[in-house]
């Protein structure tokens, strides 16, 4: 077991497995924030919303936190396992079952949209902590 000195002051005797689970979920949202910022910088324009899928998108806490941290609307479809669905749609297009991509789009529905609820000052403090943790981890990794 390796102990990272960057997080040693954040782990106490009161830290539970639930805290680790929450931190893991939140880290996904922070990483998404970093990727979105890089994409926006490369594109030269703002991304307003994200369409999500996959198993993690079923977690309402994660989706809300992701919207809070990124400031983007997070849109979850009714069917979250879209890999298989996409293959089925392509097969349907190839066989003529679906006449156009537009017909497929009409068939899709939104389960839920998450919009930012967290106040800016809290988001800014959380992002400051995330950036500090990333810098610390990078320094720690460089020392290895």
Feature roles, as predicted:
Residues 8-144:
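Glycine/Thr-rich phosphate-binding loops that ligate phosphate moieties of nucleotide
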Residues 1-7:
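Short, small-residue-biased leader/transition segments that mark boundaries at the very start
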